């Protein structure tokens, strides 16, 4: 059975929104120098040990791989374009009015994460047409 402290942390994690969970994963990856990407092949248990034992060789192949998942980041929204951008954000994300408004006002913030390049470019185009400054990572 998990300790009381672990149970509290687990409950906090359950309460996170999808965007907050994504931010948490990125922060953990940066803080500990690890990757949350699923290991290839059937060596699920051996992969983390190998990565921990030899981090330099494991990091070398990564730049060679072509990026397949992209994040659309809402960088800035001019005050006079806020309503138009808000409508597009709601359409793209399915968020409610309050959540979409919070996202738009908290820029820079990710709108969509881990999506194909074509979809990311379409979303970027829609947001820019509405007046937002957008970046695809």
UniProtKB/Swiss-Prot annotation:
GO cellular component: cytosolic large ribosomal subunit
Superkingdom of the organism of origin: Bacteria
Record's keyword terms, sorted: Ribonucleoprotein, Ribosomal protein
Listed GO MF terms: mRNA binding; structural constituent of ribosome
PANTHER family tied to this protein: 39S RIBOSOMAL PROTEIN L12 (PTHR45987), LARGE RIBOSOMAL SUBUNIT PROTEIN BL12M (PTHR45987:SF4)
Subunit and partners: Homodimer. Part of the ribosomal stalk of the 50S ribosomal subunit. Forms a multimeric L10(L12)X complex, where L10 forms an elongated spine to which 2 to 4 L12 dimers bind in a sequential fashion. Binds GTP-bound translation factors.
Protein name: Large ribosomal subunit protein bL12
């Amino acid at each position: 059975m998990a300790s009381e402290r672990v149970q509290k942390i687990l409950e906090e994690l359950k309460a996170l929104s999808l965007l907050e969970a994504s931010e948490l994963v990125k922060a953990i990856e940066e803080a500990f120098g690890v990757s949350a990407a699923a290991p290839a092949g059937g060596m699920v248990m051996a992969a983390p040990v190998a990565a921990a034992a030899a981090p330099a060789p494991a990091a070398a192949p990564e730049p060679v791989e072509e990026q397949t998942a992209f994040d659309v980041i809402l960088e800035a929204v001019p005050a006079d374009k806020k309503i138009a951008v808000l409508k597009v954000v709601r359409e793209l994300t399915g968020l409610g009015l309050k959540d979409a408004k919070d996202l738009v006002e908290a820029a820079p913030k990710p709108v969509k994460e881990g999506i194909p390049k074509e979809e990311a470019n379409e979303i970027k185009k829609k947001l820019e047409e509405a007046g937002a400054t957008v970046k695809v990572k």
